[in-house]
């Protein structure tokens, strides 16, 4: 007999990335708690190089939608997303915090942060992103993610006074899903992702 799923298991199993929101006047006070819980993550050497900015001002949300090229998204026939968000959370990466930490005396025998084959600042940023998305889903809203590769980064940094040396991983969005505008995603062939003992194709 299959055991009953835990709360966390159900949350993970039912979460999905949503990129079409509707406008809503409903308030979600729990959104205020998300930033401090998002960065409650392990960071390499306790570098604490992952930061977050929360945006709930409608004016700033609209500006971020513009800088994220939402207009081109709408022209392709998709519904509104960024501009209809109830909140946007920017995951920020401070690489210098990692380098400073690994120059300390207690890390002298560790692999230097400039030599990591997979930089831990990206590992830690991914952990923060997942925290944020699950916390959003827990409020009853739907989470989405937009990477920073197609954004006007300089303009965003200027708007939010983000220092030049800080990287923006992307936007984690929170909003009310537009269930009338669901796009049927084409099913892809299932690839084996879980392996036991050895890697098998």
Regions found by a protein language model. Give the residues of each.
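Phosphate/diphosphate-binding glycine-rich loops and adjacent basic-rich segments that engage nucleotide
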Residues: 183-201
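Short glycine-enriched loops at secondary-structure junctions
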Residues: 93-97
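A glycine-rich helix N-cap at a beta->alpha junction
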Residues: 75, 79-88, 160-184
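Short, flexible, mixed-charge acidic loops at enzyme active sites
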Residues: 100-108
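Short, hinge-like loop/turn segments at secondary-structure boundaries
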Residues: 71, 107-108, 162-164
């Amino acid at each position: 007999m299959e055991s009953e799923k835990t709360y966390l298991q159900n949350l993970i199993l039912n979460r999905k990335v949503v990129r079409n929101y509707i406008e809503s006047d409903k308030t979600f006070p729990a959104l205020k708690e998300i930033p401090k819980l998002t960065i409650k993550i392990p960071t390499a050497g306790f570098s604490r190089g992952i930061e977050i900015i929360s945006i709930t001002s409608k004016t700033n949300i609209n500006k971020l939608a513009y800088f994220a090229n939402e207009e081109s998204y709408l022209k392709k026939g998709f519904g509104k997303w960024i501009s209809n968000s109830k909140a946007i959370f920017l995951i920020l990466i401070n690489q210098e915090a990692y380098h400073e930490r690994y120059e300390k005396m207690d890390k002298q025998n560790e692999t230097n942060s400039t030599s990591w084959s997979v930089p831990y600042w990206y590992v830690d940023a991914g952990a923060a992103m997942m925290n944020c998305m699950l916390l959003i889903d827990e409020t009853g809203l739907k989470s989405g993610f937009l990477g920073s590769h197609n954004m006007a980064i300089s303009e965003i940094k200027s708007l939010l006074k983000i220092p030049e040396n800080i990287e923006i991983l992307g936007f984690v969005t929170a909003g009310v899903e537009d269930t009338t505008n669901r796009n049927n995603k084409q099913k892809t062939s299932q690839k084996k992702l879980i392996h036991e003992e050895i890697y098998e194709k």
